[in-house]
């Protein structure tokens, strides 16, 4: 995996931030001015197929996001770290915790999807899957989930 992440701060406390679906690492931008960069170092990672990694190969799964998160931490030399996850990223941080509990110091979930996933019927899954190729469906999902 290309280890691409935006790193902010130089503090000893390490934090990896994972965005929600349809988001990317730059989506955290409005919060940057509020971060404590003296005591914390933050890594904002793009998932496969998102942001700077758009067009990268899959798999495009929560398990792969968790794997890539641990690979990023290894690449950065972060033996221990905390995780912040929004929505789908909240599901991924739970998977990271399950995969490497000895490395995770704290979790913050912002409206997290459960680690077990969202309970959709077949029609719901088909609708969400079609968002990969249909901009109108993506817009409908964003409108539905953001009010």
Regions found by a protein language model. Give the residues of each.
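Conserved HGGG/HGGXW glycine-rich cap/lid loop of the alpha/beta-hydrolase fold
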Residues: 6-55
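Active-site acidic short loop of glycosyltransferases
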Residues: 10-12, 77-80, 102
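The conserved SAM/SAH-binding core of class I Rossmann-like methyltransferase domains
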Residues: 43-45, 86, 110
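Catalytic nucleophile-loop/oxyanion-hole region of alpha/beta-hydrolase
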Residues: 54-66
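Conserved acidic catalytic loop of the alpha/beta-hydrolase fold
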Residues: 64-81
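Conserved alpha/beta-hydrolase "nucleophile elbow" surrounding the catalytic nucleophile
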Residues: 81, 85-87
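Residues forming the Rossmann-fold NAD(P)(H) cofactor-binding site
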Residues: 90
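Flexible "cap/lid" loop of the alpha/beta hydrolase fold
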Residues: 94, 98, 104-134
């Amino acid at each position: 995996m290309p280890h691409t992440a935006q790193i902010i701060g130089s503090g000893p406390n390490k934090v990896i931030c994972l965005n929600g679906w349809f988001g990317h690492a730059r989506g955290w931008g409005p919060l940057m001015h509020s971060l404590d960069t003296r005591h914390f170092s933050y890594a904002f990672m793009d998932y496969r197929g998102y942001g700077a990694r758009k067009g990268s190969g899959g798999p495009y799964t929560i398990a792969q996001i968790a794997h890539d998160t641990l690979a990023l931490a290894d690449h950065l030399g972060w033996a221990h770290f905390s995780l912040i996850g929004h929505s789908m990223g909240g599901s991924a941080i739970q998977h990271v915790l399950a995969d490497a509990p000895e490395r995770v110091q704290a979790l913050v979930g912002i409206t997290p999807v459960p680690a077990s996933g969202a309970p959709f019927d077949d029609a719901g899954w088909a609708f969400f899957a079609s968002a990969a190729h249909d901009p109108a469906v993506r817009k409908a999902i964003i409108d539905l989930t953001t009010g």
